[in-house]
């Protein structure tokens, strides 16, 4: 069993990131771990289902706020990530990476590059996927 809270703690210690959450997408589609009182802590099942079922989604709601899809390879077994931008000012990069049981949401600060957010989120997802979760 993966300790999701340790991943969130690791991310929250880094000054490059504004928000992070881990959401189950197989069964309950609820938030498993998140930074409290932030946007991703408000993610609900109705926002998760379109992310995993609709490949052509352009402006998904995440935490009751609109985002704009930059690239979508979330359901691809080799890439398993989606890049987004916030649809409100200040514009921040967001990456969603898929493990076998959960989605890892990571939002960078407006000054953080998309590549940093992508690399960090994918690294966490790759480590979790290696354990079989």
Swiss-Prot record:
**SUPFAM superfamilies linked to this entry:** Profilin (actin-binding protein)
Concerning InterPro entries, the annotation shows: PFN, PFN_euk, PFN_sf
Q: Which Gene Ontology MF annotations are present?
A: actin binding
Query: Which keywords has UniProt assigned to this entry?
Result: Actin-binding
- Entry's Pfam families? Profilin
Q: Which SMART domains match?
A: PROF
Q: Does the keyword Glycosyltransferase apply?
A: no
Query: Per its database record, what is this protein's job?
Result: More likely to influence phosphoinositide metabolism than actin assembly.
What family is reported? Belongs to the profilin family.
Task: Indicate what this protein is called per its UniProt record.
Answer: Profilin
Q: Which organism is it from?
A: Camelpox virus (strain CMS)
């Amino acid at each position: 069993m993966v300790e999701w809270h340790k991943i969130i703690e690791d991310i929250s210690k880094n000054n490059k990131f504004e928000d992070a959450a881990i959401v189950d997408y197989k069964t309950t589609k609820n938030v498993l771990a998140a930074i409290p009182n932030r946007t991703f802590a408000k993610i609900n099942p109705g926002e998760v289902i379109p992310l995993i079922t609709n490949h052509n989604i352009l402006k998904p709601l995440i935490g009751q706020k609109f985002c704009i899809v930059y690239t979508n390879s979330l359901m691809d077994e080799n890439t398993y990530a989606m890049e987004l931008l916030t649809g409100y000012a200040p514009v921040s990069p967001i990456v969603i990476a898929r493990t076998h049981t959960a989605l890892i949401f990571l939002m960078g600060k407006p000054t953080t590059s998309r590549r940093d957010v992508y690399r960090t989120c994918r690294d966490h997802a790759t480590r979790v996927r290696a354990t079989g979760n």
